[in-house]
């Protein structure tokens, strides 16, 4: 029996089917992507999308919100339990909007922000000039150490003492090492700054106590996405232990930057928060890290330069210029896509290439670990990637690798 969508809108139906096929037949190594459970998908596609619910549970601007009040309260309580937080806001539509809500709540225009530079692994919303965060606030960047390619806390401290920012941001989009949130708290205390931790990429590890929790280090506020390692729907989350800050955050999210929350997404967040409390989920998170470490070590053995010489989480960067000065992330990502291996180009510390080309690629293990990959699979995958790069001009050889990948993906769950 044909689906209603295929009859009513065959073009969109066909594109969804093509994307389903692409996700099935490709090895996905985008660090910010994952595969949600059937239950999360079912919840997102539910009739909850019909309900408008401006406001917060018990304080809505529309009537008929009893059921969605209960759903949002469940999501809030599960988020609080998962991260051992006193307060949670589950309404942000994205991580970027969660960050925007925090900055709007805690800062005045032209206040100073100190965060990791984008090239070194930071995020656009942490103060980049093209983002709202760089337009409305004075943004300053710290860098990783040029030798170790890791955070240099004493250097960050000196910069903070010089700049005296109102907000310090710890948490990144392309940094492969554990973050010492306690060190950041000490630095923030010295300059009387707020400390915001953006755990969008490492939320799954924090939830399972495999990485330090910034709230335990007295971070003032924590933001996150609910996808990536947390393996929920695409959306944002804000956590804090401070009542006054939570009141400011709630006003900043609504009515500050958002209207009606997406109740079908909030319900899916609740489902994913329950999933994240299971032993199975913790085992998954442990495997994500093991896989990333085996993957990175295999590239190192093959002579590739892995930024910071390894990883403590789900991702790592490869500096392609160390392999061939003519390589760019754009070029290598395109070559790998030809053989159905999907990575993203990425800037590396102190990158001299333009952002649309970059000197590196970023590789992540969450999605394929969800598919069932173990360390041996990532060791094999590193070999295929190496072969594709070395034989990049041999289309016959690339087709051979693509066939091997297609045969392999047929076994995916």
UniProtKB/Swiss-Prot annotation:
Primary site of residence: cytoplasm
EC category name: transferase
UniProt entry keywords in alphabetical sequence: Amino-acid biosynthesis, Cytoplasm, One-carbon metabolism, Pyridoxal phosphate, Transferase
Pathway: One-carbon metabolism; tetrahydrofolate interconversion; Amino-acid biosynthesis; glycine biosynthesis; glycine from L-serine: step 1/1
Cofactor: pyridoxal 5'-phosphate
Keyword Amino-acid biosynthesis assigned: yes
Keyword Amino-acid biosynthesis belongs to the record: yes
Cell location: Cytoplasm
GO biological process, one term: glycine biosynthetic process from serine
Site (Plays an important role in substrate specificity): 227
EC number: 2.1.2.1
Gene Ontology molecular-function annotations: glycine hydroxymethyltransferase activity; pyridoxal phosphate binding
One Pfam family here: SHMT
Gene3D superfamilies associated with the record: Aspartate Aminotransferase, domain 1 (3.90.1150.10), Type I PLP-dependent aspartate aminotransferase-like (Major domain) (3.40.640.10)
Family as reported in the entry's similarity comment: Belongs to the SHMT family.
Subunit note: Homodimer.
Role summary: Catalyzes the reversible interconversion of serine and glycine with tetrahydrofolate (THF) serving as the one-carbon carrier. This reaction serves as the major source of one-carbon groups required for the biosynthesis of purines, thymidylate, methionine, and other important biomolecules. Also exhibits THF-independent aldolase activity toward beta-hydroxyamino acids, producing glycine and aldehydes, via a retro-aldol mechanism.
PANTHER family with a match to the protein in the record: SERINE HYDROXYMETHYLTRANSFERASE, SERINE HYDROXYMETHYLTRANSFERASE 1
Name by which UniProt lists this protein: Serine hydroxymethyltransferase
Organism per entry: Phytoplasma australiense
Lineage: Bacteria, Bacillati, Mycoplasmatota, Mollicutes, Acholeplasmatales
Gene assigned in the entry: glyA
């Amino acid at each position: 029996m044909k689906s209603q969508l295929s009859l009513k809108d065959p073009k969109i139906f066909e594109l969804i089917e093509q994307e389903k096929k692409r996700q099935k037949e490709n090895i996905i190594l985008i660090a910010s992507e994952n595969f949600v459970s059937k239950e999360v998908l079912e919840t997102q596609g539910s009739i909850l999308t019909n309900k408008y619910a401006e406001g917060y549970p018990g304080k809505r601007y529309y009537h008929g919100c009893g059921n969605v009040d209960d759903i949002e309260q469940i999501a809030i309580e599960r988020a609080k339990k998962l991260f051992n937080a006193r307060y949670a806001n589950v309404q942000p539509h994205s991580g970027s909007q969660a960050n925007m809500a925090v900055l709007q709540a805690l800062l005045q225009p032209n206040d100073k922000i100190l965060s990791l530079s984008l090239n070194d692994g930071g995020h656009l919303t942490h103060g980049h000039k093209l983002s709202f965060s760089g337009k409305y606030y004075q943004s300053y960047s710290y860098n990783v150490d040029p030798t170790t390619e890791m955070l240099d806390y004493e250097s960050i401290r000196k910069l903070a003492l010089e700049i005296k920012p109102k907000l310090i941001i710890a948490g990144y989009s392309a940094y492969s090492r554990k973050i010492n949130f306690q060190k950041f708290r000490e630095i923030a205390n010295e300059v009387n700054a707020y400390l915001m931790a953006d755990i969008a990429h490492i939320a799954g590890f924090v939830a399972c106590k495999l990485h330090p929790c910034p709230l335990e280090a007295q971070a003032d506020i924590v933001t996150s996405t609910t996808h990536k390692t947390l393996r929920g729907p695409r959306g944002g989350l804000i956590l804090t232990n401070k009542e006054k800050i939570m009141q400011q955050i709630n006003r900043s999210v609504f009515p500050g930057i958002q209207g009606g929350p997406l109740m079908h997404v909030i319900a899916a967040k609740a489902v994913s928060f329950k999933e994240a409390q299971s032993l199975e989920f913790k085992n998954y998170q442990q495997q994500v890290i093991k896989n990333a470490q085996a993957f990175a070590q295999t590239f190192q053995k093959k002579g590739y330069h892995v930024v910071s010489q390894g990883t403590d989480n789900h991702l790592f960067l490869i500096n392609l210029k160390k392999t061939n000065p003519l390589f760019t992330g754009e070029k290598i990502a395109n070559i790998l896509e030809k053989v159905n291996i999907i990575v993203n180009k990425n800037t590396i510390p102190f990158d001299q290439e333009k952002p649309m080309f970059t000197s590196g690629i970023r590789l992540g293990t969450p999605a394929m670990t969800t598919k069932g990959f173990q360390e041996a699979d990532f060791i094999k995958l590193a070999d295929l990637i190496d072969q594709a790069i070395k034989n990049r001009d041999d289309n016959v050889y690339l087709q051979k690798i693509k066939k091997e990948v297609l045969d392999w993906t047929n076994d995916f769950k």
